[in-house]
UniProtKB/Swiss-Prot annotation:
The gene coding this protein: fywP
Natural source organism: Lactococcus lactis subsp. cremoris (strain MG1363)
Protein's membrane topology: Multi-pass membrane protein
One annotated GO biological process: transmembrane transport
Name of the protein this chain belongs to: Aromatic amino acid permease FywP
General function of this protein: Involved in phenylalanine and tyrosine uptake. Also has affinity for tryptophan. Plays no significant role in the excretion of accumulated phenylalanine.
Length: 457
């Protein structure tokens, strides 16, 4: 089935659920959870709960906006434009596009690095080329191919987390010291004798962990740009969103809780220690636990690359849709499977540039670019909250006063977090990100896309 955008509406509710879930469960949980625990101590549990609530408020607003639209257009702009206007919608689309472009180049470097660890002796650029070709091919095939791939990649990640939860609960119940876990409760992180306090590094440590956790959830909003390719989006999107909060908190909070109770503080407080996932799997007796976790990390990062190609191509397509220029028509061209072929190729081109730079420069430059605009995802969340508030107050029957108040509180809190990020980031990174935002804002021209203006068409 097609819609007014020309794209094929073939995404189902199960795809949207896994896209949101997969976007929030990245390599950070498998690789970086130990570092977050070391920074915040037991207070990291509160960080995950608060971040999960923030995400739910944002996604709840997305669901309401989708329900109250009859014509579902592609891209982030298609969701927010009816509420905050075309100019700010244009800004949101390009900031979102720039953010995902950074994700593309950073995650390509990341997945190539981990593949090199698994398969030593192969040049890094070879892995980068494989990732670039595979990710581009999946997205060019069809939106259903992309959705099915993401569904099963997310399924694997969820299955590993469920396995960890089952093993962790089993170990807590039997409290089996001979497996290498600490049986004496005096050695566990939750006691005052080992962890100095609920937040060992004070408020700054808690705040740092909160920032990391909030933006590790970036990608869940991907559901917002799938509306043009979703079967019955008014039903599918809200249904998928309703389950986000419980799933996110369960798949993050429960594993972290188990890490805190099963591993001694001296181990979980060491930021250079092995992944807690690998540690628990190894001590249970699962062979090659470190290799298994590396494979899961590769899957998680490739999933991010795959999603980034989808997000950037749809944002680009939404910006040039309806253009009468030569470049606009070319970029708006759809394949026989109703996917924006040229928009995908342009968006994924950066991956092939990454292949060359992996062979010459390594990934240092790309890590700088990724770090410099990684917090721009908060701008998109803020705009989604503003758009939701406009809907709530314009159509008072949409929701009750509690939801309006909660959305306003989250908006203020997220804005403060964003300001603190700018202050605490190195000034070079903040300036670079500011330039991206200014270009996105001032590039707007009514009924013209940035592509048209760039080529003076």
């Amino acid at each position: 089935m097609e819609n007014s955008t020309g794209l094929k509406s073939s995404l189902k509710t199960r795809h949207i659920v896994m896209l949101s879930l997969g976007g929030a469960i990245g390599s950070g949980l498998f690789l970086g959870s130990g570092k977050v625990i070391a920074q915040a101590g037991p207070s990291v549990l509160l960080s995950y709960v608060l971040a999960g609530l923030t995400l739910y408020v944002v996604m709840y607003g997305v669901g309401k906006m989708v329900i109250h639209q009859d014509d579902h257009k592609a891209g982030m702009a298609g969701v927010v434009a009816p509420f905050i206007g075309d100019h700010w919608a244009h800004f949101a689309d390009w900031v979102y596009w720039a953010t995902w472009m950074a994700v593309l180049i950073a995650e390509e470097a990341g997945v190539s690095t981990f593949l090199a660890i698994l398969i030593p002796g192969v040049p890094l650029w070879v892995f980068a080329l494989v990732v670039a070709v595979l990710g581009t091919a999946i997205n060019l095939w069809s939106v259903k191919a992309f959705a099915e791939t993401e569904y099963w990649l997310a399924f694997i990640k969820v299955a590993v987390i469920l396995l960890l939860i089952a093993l962790g609960i089993y170990l807590l119940v039997i409290n089996d010291a001979h497996l290498g876990f600490v049986a004496d409760s005096a050695q566990k992180v939750t006691t005052k004798s080992t962890a100095p306090s609920f937040a060992p590094n004070g408020f700054s440590g808690f705040l740092t962990s909160l920032l990391v956790v909030i933006f590790s959830f970036g990608g869940s909003e991907l559901a917002a740009i799938t509306v043009a390719e979703t079967e019955n989006p008014k039903v599918a999107i809200p249904r998928a969103i309703r389950g986000v909060l419980i799933r996110i908190i369960s798949f993050y909070v429960i594993p972290i809780f188990l890490f805190l109770h099963l591993l001694p503080w001296s181990e979980v407080s060491n930021p250079d220690a092995a992944s807690p996932f690998a540690t628990i799997f190894a001590r249970v007796g699962i062979p090659h636990a470190d290799k298994i976790v590396l494979v899961i990390i590769v899957i998680a990062i490739f999933s991010a690359v795959n999603s980034a190609i989808y997000a950037t191509s749809r944002s680009l397509y939404s910006r040039i849709q309806g253009s009468s220029t030569y470049v606009g028509k070319k970029l708006g061209k759809l394949s026989k499977n109703q996917v924006p072929t040229n928009a995908i190729l342009v968006s994924s081109f950066v991956l092939f540039i990454g292949v060359l730079l992996s062979a010459v420069l390594g990934d240092g430059f790309w890590q700088f670019v990724a770090g410099s605009i990684s917090f721009t995802i908060s701008i998109v969340w803020i705009l989604l909250l503003v758009a939701a508030l406009v809907l709530y107050f314009k159509h008072k029957e949409v929701t009750n006063w509690f939801v309006k108040l909660a959305t306003l509180v989250v908006l203020i809190a997220l804005s403060l977090v964003f300001i603190m990020q700018i202050i605490t980031n190195p000034w070079t990174l903040s300036v670079f990100a500011l330039v991206i935002c200014l270009l996105s804002y001032f590039s707007y021209r009514k009924k013209k896309s940035i592509i048209e203006k760039t080529f003076i068409l």
